[in-house]
Amino acid sequence: MTTPNKTPPGADPKQLERTGTVREIGSQAVWSLSSCKPGFGVDQLRDDNLETYWQSDGSQPHLVNLQFRRKTTVKTLCIYADYKSDESYTPSKISVRVGNNFHNLQEIRQLELVEPSGWIHVPLTDNHKKPTRTFMIQIAVLANHQNGRDTHMRQIKIYTPVEESSIGKFPRCTTIDFMMYRSIR
C-alpha cells in the first residue's frame, strides 16, 4: 500500500510537460471503461475540463483501461479527484495495474486516498526509478469515500519520459571556419 507523491495542492501536471522531461500520451491509447452513465464517459475524462467527469454505473471495482498499440514506456499517471465536489463518489482506494493484456495484469501500485482535492501524481516506476514498459494500464477503483457505490474521476493523464535526441549532443560550431559550413545552401 502506497500513498501518491506529495504535490502542492492543485499542482497541474502540465507543469511537468513544461519542464520538457515528459509528454502526455493519452491520445495514443485506446480507452475503455467498465461502465458509465450516458454523457459521463471517456470524452469527459479526457477533455481537459475539471468541471466534467466520468461517472461509473455499476458494481465495483470500476475500471479505466488504456491499451497501447505497441509496448510503451510510461513514467507518471495523474488523476484529478475532488472530494469537496464529489463526496461519496470520490475514490478512496485505487489499484494501478500493468501488463500485455487483460489476462496478465499485475498490480504495481495501490493507493489509499483521504479526501483528495487536486491532482494525484502516481509514479509508474520500479524500485530503481526506471519507467515501466507496457501495452496496457488498468486503473481500478476498489472503494469510495463513505462507502459510495459509483465513482467520479475528473481527469486522467499519462506521461512518458522525453528521450534526448542525438542531435543535441553535438558540440556547437564556434570558430569562423566551422560556422562557414553550418548550413546547406
From Swiss-Prot:
It comes from the Eukaryota. Residues 2-185 form the DOC domain. The keyword DNA damage does not apply. Pfam families: ANAPC10. One of its GO terms (biological process) is protein branched polyubiquitination. Keywords: Acetylation, Cell cycle, Cell division, Mitosis, Ubl conjugation pathway. The modification N-acetylthreonine is found at residue 2. The modification N6-acetyllysine is found at residue 169. Pathway: Protein modification; protein ubiquitination. Component of the anaphase promoting complex/cyclosome (APC/C), a cell cycle-regulated E3 ubiquitin ligase that controls progression through mitosis and the G1 phase of the cell cycle. The APC/C complex acts by mediating ubiquitination and subsequent degradation of target proteins: it mainly mediates the formation of 'Lys-11'-linked polyubiquitin chains and, to a lower extent, the formation of 'Lys-48'- and 'Lys-63'-linked polyubiquitin chains. The APC/C complex catalyzes assembly of branched 'Lys-11'-/'Lys-48'-linked branched ubiquitin chains on target proteins. This is Anaphase-promoting complex subunit 10. It comes from Bos taurus (Bovine).
